[in-house]
Regions:
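Alpha-helical scaffold segments that mediate packing/assembly in large oligomeric complexes
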Residues: 1-31, 137-143
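Short gly/pro-enriched beta-turn/loop segments at secondary-structure junctions
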Residues: 33-38
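Active-site pocket-lining segment
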Residues: 44-58
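Sequence/fold signature of self-assembling virion shell proteins
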Residues: 55-143
């Protein structure tokens, strides 16, 4: 479902996710000629927390994988709409939204008439698609 269900996106194993996995995610996208300045990571809040505490290098005075909400210079966005354990990297300008018609707002004075209220209902027909699946890579089951 969503970008994760789109055929053609890159994939990266998430077990023992390390700096090299992040670089590989970026490389998969760049090698497919989808590399643009607007790339970013999008992760579940749990994964962001995990990677904020995971050293990129060093253990005595470590440099962590995510610092200042960036991973290797790319922004890290957070949403809990992504499955726990998953993280995307890609060009999110390649996600397209299509709209058919306009927002249809209807006033229903009958449903709540006995209570003296008016019900307002809104309808809109939209869909979302990925224009270039190679512009994304997904790491799953990050540990």
């Amino acid at each position: 479902m969503g970008i994760a269900g789109v055929s053609g996106i890159g994939s990266e194993a998430g077990a023992s996710f390390a700096w090299s996995n992040a670089v590989n995610m970026e490389t998969l996208v760049a090698a497919a000629n989808a590399d643009v300045a607007g790339m970013r990571y999008v992760a579940n809040a749990t994964i962001r927390g995990l990677l904020k505490g995971r050293p990129k290098i060093g253990t005595t005075y470590p440099v962590f994988m995510i610092e200042d909400n960036q991973l290797n210079g790319y922004p890290v966005e957070v949403t809990n709409q992504i499955a726990a354990g998953d993280m995307f990297f890609g060009d999110f300008t390649q996600v397209m939204m299509g709209e058919w018609g306009v927002l249809d707002i209807l006033v229903d004075p009958y449903t709540g008439s006995s209570a003296g209220t008016v019900r307002i209902v809104a309808f809109q027909s939209v869909d979302v698609a990925v224009r270039h699946p190679v512009a994304f890579t997904l790491a799953t089951s990050i540990t």
